[in-house]
Design a protein with these regions (language model features):
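Hydrophobic cores of alpha-helical transmembrane segments in multi-pass integral membrane proteins
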Residues: 1-82, 94-121, 137-167, 173-237
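Short helix/strand-bridging catalytic loops that position acidic/His residues to coordinate divalent metals
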Residues: 88, 132, 168-171
């Protein structure tokens, strides 16, 4: 069965109460988006850990990343917001589900990449590092998770375009958030291209994953604060 820890993760209950009280899912403010991202990412990792036992000790890296994300969530306003008519769409829900799966896959891929850097460092291995799989195995799973995230990101963009057409009458308007989503998609596509075509080394791949994740954070969660877009109504605040 799934480890019982999944029921004790702190972001879950406030996110659930928030969604219940507002009458909509947790996707209408920075607090709701990031706290639900944290909850889903931790659940995603626990499911991976359940299926792939060698991931048990990777939690020492995944959980700090999750707590940082939750910390940023708590910096946002927890004020309940009404759901605007443009957000009342089944396509939006699909769009959001795949967005959260993308974040989850990226987060665990980054944890695997950090684990690779620690195991590759000249310092002698100690503690949980000795219990992690080899660098080759970590690299392989990081690659798989980025491929998974690339697929979910693709679905996120496609369903977002369908939602935009239903709400505003166009599939693509080069809205800043749309544009930066495309840039992030190209960044992760370049990683897969580099791995498959140019046989990038593990060192290049590891750093690329980490830097790409940082770039995606800026694109999805920081730029909307400075550039007005159709997404700003629910991503900022």
């Amino acid at each position: 069965s799934v480890p019982p820890r999944v029921c004790r993760c702190p972001p879950g209950r406030p996110t659930t109460r928030q969604a219940s009280a507002a009458g909509h899912g947790p996707y209408v403010s920075t607090y709701e988006i990031l706290s639900s991202n944290t909850w889903i990412a931790v659940t995603f990792f626990l499911l991976l850990q359940w299926r792939i036992r060698m991931f048990v000790h990777l939690g020492a890296l995944v959980m700090p990343l999750a707590f940082v994300m939750m910390g940023f969530a708590l910096m946002g306003s927890a004020e309940l917001k009404a759901l605007s008519p443009t957000l009342q769409s089944a396509w939006l829900l699909v769009h959001i589900v795949f967005a959260k799966l993308t974040v989850s896959g990226m987060l665990v891929a980054v944890a695997l990449s950090i684990a690779q850097l620690l195991k590759d460092s000249r310092a002698p291995e100690s503690g949980f590092l000795t219990k992690l799989p080899s660098v080759d195995v970590l690299d392989d799973y990081a690659y798989r998770l980025v491929a998974f995230s690339f697929i979910t990101l693709t679905v996120m963009i496609i369903t977002g375009s369908i939602w935009a057409n239903n709400s505003w009458g166009h599939y693509w308007s080069w809205d800043p958030t749309e544009t930066w989503s495309l840039v992030v998609w190209l960044v992760y596509g370049l990683y897969l291209h580099g791995r498959i075509t140019f046989k990038w080394s593990k060192a290049i791949s590891t750093w690329y994953i980490i830097l790409s994740f940082l770039f995606s954070i800026v694109a999805f969660f920081i730029i909307p604060y400075f550039v007005k877009s159709q997404h700003s109504q629910y991503m900022v605040g």
